[in-house]
């Protein structure tokens, strides 16, 4: 009897020892995971639809991961073809609906328009050679070009000109997209996408969420324990309206959205890095002079370039005035209700320019590090 008792006690002791060891290992792993979690900078990308958020994520992959594999590049071919089809369909489809309407320079091209509208619009369209032929010929037509110039009067993807200029390349059977093609390619973001990368042994998790109005309800899921918000706005959208609501100016929507995020009670301690994006397109519009900023934002007529403005060599003074006016519209919101718990850090960006994003993100890293230290009360 005693023998059995001592064997049982010994077994219990062994079991306890194993259990303690297992608990110790679990606790050790929990502590390790906690350290990794606390050492990770979580960045939430917010902004209205088509502001350039997903392009910023692609740049992080190019700059800090391994870019895109040959297979991933080939997988983008279909999306790029869709962009070309969407662009030529939209432009030719709006020629007759504009006020005043626009006619083809060469009426003999009408059969090409009919093909685009009737055949290329079909769901199971497979991009035969004649599609590229018709698209290239139409894109050279001055009437089609004139309709493109009035793109702010209807909804057209930003990359339309970029890809329509490259149809002769995309149509090749051995075509492989370049990094610039992938950066320019427009695909609607639905849901939440996380990108992980490391810079100088510091871990970053970047969350990209859809910017269209019906996607924004998902944002709240990402607010927990965020280091910083990167708010992206398309500065070139000052003369455009929303896809979801043609009565609302896109830049005004972006300002309203920024205000709601800045004043959100759950985000009062999270600072915002403001990416004033699409500076290249803004400069083009201002220099062209067809869509005047003051026609959409009357205060611009009285606005003077601030003393803190940095002017790039050869930069048009009117472009400088425009970009700082838009910056100050956002800063008016952040300074009006700032309580010293969170700050707004503006940067002028061109999301398709890898060197620009490299420089801007390097400038932001110190800011993000300070936010991270403050988040865990180490500063």
UniProtKB/Swiss-Prot annotation:
SUPFAM superfamilies: P-loop containing nucleoside triphosphate hydrolases, Transducin (alpha subunit), insertion domain. InterPro entries: Gprotein_alpha_S (IPR000367), Gprotein_alpha_su (IPR001019), GproteinA_insert (IPR011025), P-loop_NTPase (IPR027417). Residues 42-55 are annotated as: G1 motif. Mg(2+) binds at residues 54, 189. One of its GO terms (cellular component) is heterotrimeric G-protein complex. GO terms for molecular function: G protein-coupled receptor binding; G-protein beta/gamma-subunit complex binding; GTP binding; GTPase activity; metal ion binding. Keywords: GTP-binding, Lipoprotein, Magnesium, Metal-binding, Nucleotide-binding, Palmitate, Transducer. Belongs to the G-alpha family. G(s) subfamily. Residues 1-29 are annotated as: Disordered. It comes from Homarus americanus (American lobster). Residues 39-379 form the G-alpha domain. A lipid is attached at residue 2 (N-palmitoyl glycine). GTP binds at residues 47-54, 183-189, 208-212, 277-280, 351. This is Guanine nucleotide-binding protein G(s) subunit alpha. GO terms for biological process: adenylate cyclase-activating dopamine receptor signaling pathway; sensory perception of chemical stimulus. Residues 273-280 are annotated as: G4 motif. G proteins are composed of 3 units; alpha, beta and gamma. The alpha chain contains the guanine nucleotide binding site. CDD domains: G-alpha. Residues 204-213 are annotated as: G3 motif. The keyword Iron does not apply. Coiled coil: none annotated. A lipid is attached at residue 3 (S-palmitoyl cysteine). Residues 349-354 are annotated as: G5 motif. Guanine nucleotide-binding proteins (G proteins) are involved as modulators or transducers in various transmembrane signaling systems. The G(s) protein is involved in hormonal regulation of adenylate cyclase: it activates the cyclase in response to beta-adrenergic stimuli. Residues 181-189 are annotated as: G2 motif. Pfam families: G-alpha.
